[in-house]
């Protein structure tokens, strides 16, 4: 899948060039203050590389929140400019817009070594192509206006760099509409592509997928694509109950059941069998009398089933042993979705046990990739982000890659030289 082999910033001659970088500064804000600067800090190596390799200017563009195509002050990137200034230890010029004649003039011939941050891209309808007006009505962008918006962005630099993996699955103007002859990945995006290509193009085997999450229907495309690639697959989380009920007639009580997904369970299991993929389902569960931290809990086997009025919220200790054995065999592991409701400590043991085993496997030389979203949150909770090979920064984007889809923001980049 050489579609992931793209031109990267370290293959470019940046001397004297204005470098336009699409970053992901979509940071959490509370009362106008940044509560977690991780996304800003993560972009610093790409910015520093451009500056230390003689770039005339670095122009940064990002979205923040969902202003839906109109200016809303609570979504301003102004606080990001201050944070960036502190991290780079140099001045950052913040512009009040991201396109238009004034912005173009400010970016045309800036002082050498300038860092410029543009205002929120999504203040303009033309970034996403659609939005919501002040009255709450849905509106679509006019194609001529989109073209003009993209042309204005293109004028702000000589070279385009994309370092926003979290938005790579969106065909937004800043992701696909900048018309420079050289369009490269920054270090964050390059790192994401390199790890996913290790898993999806040429994995060391056995290759294991660990899948969790609530609905089978949401993961059908993911399961189908991975069945063509993996040797073993663990199915945990809420969707395991639908599999067990359909395939083995297990009583699941009030556990999550996905009517839509249930229709395809047998087809997926037959496909796994035909392809020689070993599927591991839970054999026991930790059940609760309600969905709450203070629920009364106990462990039951799949044979016993979940009694009515109870729901399974985690996998049990025997399941964890079976899963651990599969992890110990694997040389490549992709994990997308927790084993249980790890947000409640009482029902976190299954996910924590998987995490411990994945960390051990990494130390023993396996390539281990945690897809974004809830599993990345679990890695943060258990402080294991630096103890696995890679934690993806993009929930939706990583899911679409694993589903076998082409990401528009990646597709728009120049091929590697």
Swiss-Prot record:
Pfam family, one: PGK
Pathway: Carbohydrate degradation; glycolysis; pyruvate from D-glyceraldehyde 3-phosphate: step 2/5
Catalytic activity: (2R)-3-phosphoglycerate + ATP = (2R)-3-phospho-glyceroyl phosphate + ADP
Assembly with partners or alone: Monomer.
UniProt: ATP binding residues: 214, 219, 238, 312, 343, 374-375
Major localization class: cytoplasm
Binding residues for (2R)-3-phosphoglycerate: 23-26, 38-39, 62-63, 65-66, 121-122, 169-170
Cofactor(s) needed: Mg(2+)
Localization: Cytoplasm
One GO term describing the cellular component: cytosol
Binding site for AMP: 214-215, 219, 238, 312, 343
Record's protein name: Probable phosphoglycerate kinase
MF annotations from Gene Ontology: ADP binding; ATP binding; metal ion binding; phosphoglycerate kinase activity
Gene Ontology biological process terms from the UniProt entry: gluconeogenesis; glycolytic process
Residues bound to CDP: 213, 218, 237, 337, 339, 342
UniProt keyword annotations, A-Z: ATP-binding, Cytoplasm, Glycolysis, Kinase, Magnesium, Metal-binding, Nucleotide-binding, Transferase
Documented EC number(s): 2.7.2.3
Family listed: Belongs to the phosphoglycerate kinase family.
Residues reported to bind ADP: 213, 237, 342
Binding site for Mg(2+): 214, 217-218, 374
Highest taxon, organism lineage: Eukaryota
